[in-house]
Amino acid sequence: MSVEAYGPSSQTLTFLDTEETELLGADTQGSEYDFTDFTLPSQTQTQGHTQSQLDNQLNGPDDGLHNGGMDDSVAKASQLLAELNFEEDEEDTYYTKDLPVHACRSYCGIHDPACVVYCNTSKKWFCNGRGNTSGSHIVNHLVRAKCKEVTLHKDGPLGETVLECYNCGCRNVFLLGFIPAKADSVVVLLCRQPCASQSSLKDINWDSSQWQPLIQDRCFLSWLVKIPSEQEQLRARQITAQQINKLEELWKDNPCATLEDLEKPGVDEEPQHVLLRYEDAYQYQNIFGPLVKLEADYDKKLKESQTQDNITVRWDLGLNKKRIAYFTLPKTDSDMRLMQGDEICLRYKGDLAPLWKGIGHVIKVPDSYGDEIAIELRTSVGAPVEIPHNYQVDFVWKSTSFDRMQSALKTFAVDETSVSGYIYHKLLGHEVEDVTIKCQLPKRFTANGLPDLNHSQVYAVKTVLQRPLSLIQGPPGTGKTVTSATIVYHLSRQGNGPVLVCAPSNIAVDQLTEKIDKTGLKVVRLCAKSREAIESPVSFLALHNQISNMDSMPELQKLQQLKDETGELSSADEKRYRALKRTAERELLMNADVIWCTCVRAGDPRLAKMQFRSILIDESTQATEPKCIGPVELGAKQLILGEITASWSCVMCKKAAKAGLSQSLFERLVVLGIRPIRLQVQYRMHPALSAFPSNIFYEGSLQNGVTAGDRIKKGFDFQWPQPEKPMFFYVTQGQEEIASSGTSYLNRTEAANVEKITTRLLKAGAKPDQIGIITPYEGQRSYLVQYMQFSGSLHTKLYQVEIASVDAFQGREKDFIILSCVRANEHQGIGFLNDPRRLNVALTRAKYGVIIVGNPKALSKQPLWNNLLNNYKEQKVLVEGPLNNLRESLMQFSKPRKLVNTINPRFMSTAMYDAREALIPGSAYDRSNTGGRPSNMYFQTHDQIGMIGAAASHLAALNIPIPFNLVMPPMPPPSYQGQTNGPAAGRGAMKGKSGRGGRQRIQWFWEPGGWSHAKQSDQPGWGFPVILSGATDTGLHLHEPAFPDEPARTLPARALPWDSYLGDEFKSQIDVALSQDSTYQGERAYQHGGVTGLSQY
């Protein structure tokens, strides 16, 4: 076995036998462990004439004008200029024809053998220069193309070498690094894990602490691959990051594509962007339908490309007698996230048994305690359970969720019974008069079995019950789940049929279901068949489990028992079993008080013939708009959208996200002027922990429902730098590294410090399940899991703390939170940490204490983090040094910029360059006269380069980019609200939705005597008395004035979470806009280009 090393000559890579000790003493480096000086003179090839030669040709010798005369000189200069122009015309030909094979021809054209690297997967050469991008061209390509193996050029300083680990042969360049060894004359390439961390390295005199990655700051180390000089890069073809992104996308379908192909028509065609207002539901469907298809196509392509070979399987038998396969997948660079219930195809490809294939669904996903995945097979007939090796895993793509979204969009457009007229027009952005539902309000708003409500929660419940459309905003720890459950309780008690409650995720559904079950209502949890075997706290409420316990259908129970024991039924029994099961499902659903499901599950055929008057969608900002339409089109006449302020929807397809699919329905309605009701009292955080989030994200409106004394943990002995403030920022100087996937980051120094802090917390009395470690990067999460298990000083079981991403911690809490920031670089920015929503989530998860571990120098360049660091420094909790002797850091930061809001100076800037602001031309969010598109860096996508870093310069340099849905934004200026009453300006009268030939379908409706069915032509009415805007009999005015000091409110000002406006120029206009009256004359009638009235909503 030989090791790659620098031999006596610095011109070649020498392979040395480890036994030849006489060669190991050669000193080839001038400085200790410093290989950055190892560079060679570039083998520069002239590109055309040099500037000096051209100058000489144009000007001629000094005496040219005297000897040849003026005319001859001019003629000669003209001829040379013509030749020069001809050379410019041929510039593109130079890049395509005259470049050698090893040139970075796809990008810039640089072809110095010392500067280029060969991608073994794509079979293309790329240089190590940055050009106009934040990383080198080779690293840009490796990340975007998801490649990992490279070869150096044969004429380069190290010869033709495939970079690989000396110990295990790993060729993933994102894992590879080097260790100086044996008297500094040899460098050994080793992978980060596990080889570089093995203790056996000390036996051969290799110091693992000196391990450094081959790629730093998104460039290969200069001693390994030369970085082209600035002059060379200026002479090369200039290619932008945007062109690189488009070209890489094009290569997925056409590997031979060139930059010239980007100019062809149709290559970069963008879908139609979402609108703020829609003329009708047909336009709505025509815009969102293609975006849903884009997302579906991307998701399908992503899943079908995830095949993994050479998988080792561990077989087991479940309690239900079904086979379970356990296996671990290699670390992938995919955006795809495996979820419980996903389908996987497992194949045996070996020679020891017949070929076999089985389908199963995921019942266990990787977590903080291990990376093992478990699937439960539908049938295990023929499965080679005795053989552990040679398996292949395929991800099964199912179009169900996308099909249901498309179906919901179509139903919303063509079926008049799908939603009330009022909600229909409100969702489309039409100008309609606000209405109030006249209902019997409860004398006591607190629901049975739930905690008492505070003033803002009572106000929220009271207001929601009287409105057909409401938005609820719940900052962290303010009890939004309890408030939502209370609202559902009172809606169900009104006797208007079951209430449908949905959320984007199963976790959110389960949390809310658990609360409402305590009230004693009849609750049914509807879930996918693939999730029926997955345990949750509310499994007993699931429809399939309730059917199993129905005493009224003994025949069904017998058939179910027989099927569980034998695995299958005869044809006749199976037919009878399905019929009985459908009857039981229908009976349970129709007798339920509340039905719970995910937004996509609302399109389940079992709900197809039911309609729901009251629908609540929780955490609606986590769902795209088409997902929300699924529940809404089931007959919504009263719609409540709940929102956790730090949430966001995830759209994988970049094109769809840029077109606005990532914008939620909640956000668009806020932009349209529907004011959310905000809860104000938080019960989670120590007051010291809530101060910064309250002031920055919630305009100081959060009130503390707990005292500092309530948040002193008994039996916990931990020395905080400031005892009355259980928080600190631990200064760490480590450098970030690209993770093995190439699309994420890790920071080994931070990981070591996080382990030390965790150990101190455990020794101080905290339990593992009371500690949460948050990091924005999957690379750091995975590295921390392994580091804690193998390098922790305590028993491994004590390190079973939850380590997860910011997204995974949404809506949850821990006693103590440790935040690992990861980012530490000179050129790349701070990536995910730019997103204030993620910072808000991270800072608001803890009850008793928060510890941030990061590099202040890198973070302080971003305005929001600069504010945070200055805040911590002022409070003397910015510390450094050993944990047992922390001292205040002396680091200085620039003075934080003043936070300014152009409409409402009382609040901070709400500028975030995203779809929702760009939709309002001329508003505070529009930074151009043309309503230009926002910066791509703020679209919520999972683009790989976006994960690694964003451009350092953007329009938000003067403001902190707080997202729209983080704060309660000012209402759009009335001058925009009233521009000819909506999108039909200048078009005359609009056609209403009535009479548009919808399809007929049998539907079930709730009447006082119970469920009945009718066709859409004889659909019963709303059943609730409706009054126009004005004072209700309860004394609550629906149209509150814009200023809390005005006398129209009957509740105390502190109980009203609506924000005030200080802009006098908008006061009178807003009051007028909020008090317009009209007469309702028809179902969905329009008049003078706007909606004038609705008799049924």
From Swiss-Prot:
Ranges for the region named C4 are: 165-195
Binding of ATP occurs at: 457, 474-481, 683, 813
Q: Region entry C3H: which residue ranges?
A: 104-137
> What residue stretches are annotated with the Upf1 CH-rich domain?
96-254
On the tree of life, the source organism's domain of life is Eukaryota
Any GO BP annotation: nuclear-transcribed mRNA catabolic process, nonsense-mediated decay
Q: Which residues are noted in the entry as Zn(2+) 1-binding? A: 104, 108, 127, 137
What is the recorded name of this protein? Putative regulator of nonsense transcripts 1
Top-down, what is the taxonomic lineage of the species of origin? Eukaryota, Metazoa, Chordata, Craniata, Vertebrata
